[in-house]
Swiss-Prot record:
<dbReference type="Pfam" id="PF02720">
    <property type="entry name" value="DUF222"/>
</dbReference>
<dbReference type="InterPro" id="IPR003615">
    <property type="entry name" value="HNH_nuc"/>
</dbReference>
<dbReference type="InterPro" id="IPR002711">
    <property type="entry name" value="HNH"/>
</dbReference>
<dbReference type="InterPro" id="IPR003870">
    <property type="entry name" value="DUF222"/>
</dbReference>
<comment type="similarity">
    <text>Belongs to the Rv1128c/1148c/1588c/1702c/1945/3466 family.</text>
</comment>
<dbReference type="Pfam" id="PF01844">
    <property type="entry name" value="HNH"/>
</dbReference>
<dbReference type="GO" id="GO:0008270">
    <property type="term" value="F:zinc ion binding"/>
</dbReference>
<feature type="domain" description="HNH">
    <location>
        <begin position="364"/>
        <end position="405"/>
    </location>
</feature>
<feature type="region of interest" description="Disordered">
    <location>
        <begin position="415"/>
        <end position="434"/>
    </location>
</feature>
<dbReference type="GO" id="GO:0004519">
    <property type="term" value="F:endonuclease activity"/>
</dbReference>
<protein>
    <recommendedName>
        <fullName>Uncharacterized protein MT1995</fullName>
    </recommendedName>
</protein>
<dbReference type="GO" id="GO:0003676">
    <property type="term" value="F:nucleic acid binding"/>
</dbReference>
Length: 454
C-alpha cells in the first residue's frame, strides 16, 4: 500500500481548508427552497465522509503511540488536543476500531470489521447515528451467531441505513435481532457485561440524573432495603425526628405526602448515610471513607452559597449544615485563599494535609483532567528525593495516570500564587495552559486569564 508523504498530506488538508472556507463565504439568497435543501444534503454527505477520514489517523495513533508520547491515554490525548469530551473521544476511537482499516501483525492491511458500514460512511450515505444503531446491534448479538450470518446482517443493515433515518433503522434492527436471536441474552455472563450505574453531571440546580442496568441480585438487594427505609412514613425529612430504625406509626404514615419515587430517594440516602456513619467502609487513599467538603468562612457565616465535595459535587450551604449534624464529615474553611481551619466532628487519626488538598485543589491539578479529589493521589511538586520533606505548600493532587507522567518527561512547579503548573515535554507542548482551572470555574469567570504558557 502506497504511503503519502508529509507534503502531500499537508497539501491535501490545506486544499480541504481552502475549499471549506470558500463554501462558508457563499451567499445563498438566490436559491429556491428545493435548491437550499439539495445544498444541505450535499453538505451532510461531506460531513459524514469527514468522520471516515479520521479513522486511519486514530487507528495509527492507537497502534504506534505509547502513553508517554501522548501524555496519557489516547482517549485523554484526543479530548485535550481536540477540545472534545472524553466520552466523544471514546466514541471516535470505538468507531475507528469498527470502521477503519486495520493492519495484521505482519503489517498487511486488513479490511474494516464492519465492512459494509465503513463503505457507506466513506460514500457519505450514512452518519454517526446510523453507525451507532449498527454498533448497538452487534453489541447485543450473541456470539453464537456464525460469521456468515453476522456479515450478511451487517450488509443488510448498512444498505437499509442509506435510505432511512436512524430512528427508523432502529426498528428494523430490533426486528432483525428478534429473528436471529429470538431467545435473547439471558446468561450470567451477558447480564454481568451489561450491568452498570451512571450518575449524570450536576444540573444548574444541583440535581443529578441517574441511569443504568441492575443485575437481578442488586435489584433484589435494593428491594429489601427500600421495603424498610422507603416505606410510607419512614425516613421522612419533613419529620422533626425521622423514623429510621422503628416501624412508622399511623400518624407518621398520614403525614407522609411524598411520592413513591421520593420515598425511594430518601430511603437510599438514609441507608448510605448509615453506612458512612458506621465506619465499616475502612479507608480510601489514606482517609476514612467520609464526605469532605470545602467552603469559605464568609459563606458559612452567612449560611449561603455552596461547598465543594472531594468528588467535585456542589452542595448548597443548607444541605452542608444539615449533613454536619448527621455524620462524621470533614469541613475545611478558607479565609480568602488561605486555609483557615479544619473542623471535624470525630477525632480520627487521618492525614490533615490530604484534607486541605481536597479543599484547595478539589481534584487533579494537571490541565485538562477532571478527576475529582476522591480519585486523586498526593503528588510532591518538588520530588521528595530532592527535599526529603512533605510540606503542604509543596504538595498537590494528581490522579494516578497523571502522577506517573512526572516520570516520563513532565515537570511540576508552584507559581507565586501557590498554583501548581504542569510543564509538558517539548514534543507535547502546543501552547496549552499550565494550570488546571476545571475544578475552580469561579476563577475562570472572575479572574484574568493568567495561566497561559510562559
Amino acid at each position: 500500500m502506497r504511503s503519502d508523504t508529509r507534503e502531500e498530506i499537508s497539501a491535501a488538508l490545506d486544499a480541504y481548508h481552502a475549499s471549506l472556507s470558500r463554501v462558508l463565504d457563499l451567499k445563498c439568497d438566490a436559491l429556491t427552497t428545493p435548491e437550499l435543501l439539495a445544498c444541505l444534503q450535499r453538505l451532510e454527505v461531506e460531513r459524514r465522509r469527514q468522520g471516515a477520514a479520521e479513522h486511519a489517523l486514530i487507528n495509527q495513533l492507537a497502534g504506534q503511540a505509547c502513553e508517554e508520547e501522548l501524555g496519557g491515554t489516547l482517549r485523554t490525548a484526543l479530548a485535550n488536543r481536540l477540545h472534545i469530551t472524553p466520552g466523544e473521544a471514546s466514541r471516535r476511537i470505538a468507531e475507528a476500531e469498527d470502521l477503519g482499516e486495520r493492519r495484521a501483525l505482519t503489517g498487511e492491511p486488513l479490511p474494516a470489521q464492519l465492512t459494509a458500514t465503513a463503505a457507506a460512511q466513506r460514500e457519505g450515505k450514512i452518519g454517526r447515528e446510523h453507525i451507532k444503531e449498527i454498533q448497538a446491534f452487534f453489541k447485543e448479538l450473541s456470539a453464537a451467531v456464525d460469521l456468515g450470518i453476522r456479515e450478511a446482517a451487517e450488509a443488510q443493515l448498512a444498505e437499509l441505513a442509506t435510505s432511512r433515518r436512524p430512528d427508523h433503522l432502529h426498528g428494523l434492527a430490533t426486528q432483525l435481532m428478534d429473528w436471529l436471536h429470538p431467545d435473547g441474552n439471558f446468561s450470567d455472563q451477558e447480564r454481568a457485561r451489561k450491568r452498570g450505574i451512571t450518575m449524570g453531571k450536576q444540573e444548574f440546580d444541583g440535581m443529578s440524573r441517574i441511569s443504568g442496568l441492575l443485575t437481578p441480585e442488586l435489584r433484589a438487594t435494593i428491594e429489601a432495603v427500600l421495603a424498610k427505609l422507603a416505606a410510607p412514613g419512614a425516613c421522612n425529612p419533613d419529620d422533626q425526628t425521622p423514623v429510621v430504625d422503628d416501624t412508622p406509626d399511623a400518624d407518621a404514615v398520614r403525614r407522609d405526602t411524598r411520592s413513591q419515587a421520593q420515598r425511594h430517594h430518601d430511603g437510599l440516602l438514609a441507608g448510605l448515610r448509615g453506612l458512612l456513619a458506621s465506619g465499616e467502609l475502612g479507608q480510601h487513599r489514606g482517609l476514612p471513607v467520609t464526605v469532605v467538603v470545602s467552603t469559605t468562612l464568609k459563606e458559612l457565616e452567612a449560611a449561603t452559597g455552596k461547598g465543594v465535595t472531594g468528588g467535585g459535587s456542589r452542595v448548597p450551604m443548607s444541605d452542608l449544615i444539615r449533613m454536619a449534624s448527621n455524620a462524621h464529615h470533614y469541613l475545611a474553611l478558607f479565609d480568602g485563599a488561605k486555609p483557615l481551619a479544619l473542623y471535624h466532628t470525630k477525632r480520627l487519626a487521618s492525614p490533615a494535609q490530604r484534607i486541605m488538598l481536597y479543599a484547595k485543589d478539589r481534584g487533579c491539578s494537571r490541565p485538562g483532567c477532571d478527576a475529582p479529589a476522591y480519585h486523586s493521589e498526593v503528588h510532591h511538586v518538588t520530588p521528595w528525593t530532592t527535599t526529603h520533606r512533605t510540606d503542604i505548600n509543596d504538595l498537590t493532587l494528581a490522579c494516578g495516570p497523571d502522577n506517573r507522567l512526572v516520570e516520563k518527561g513532565w515537570k511540576t512547579r508552584k507559581n507565586a500564587k501557590g498554583d501548581t503548573e504542569w510543564l509538558p515535554p517539548a514534543h507535547l507542548d502546543h501552547g496549552q495552559p499550565r494550570i488546571n482551572r476545571y475544578h475552580h470555574p469561579e476563577k475562570i469567570l472572575c479572574e484574568p486569564d493568567d495561566d497561559e504558557p510562559h
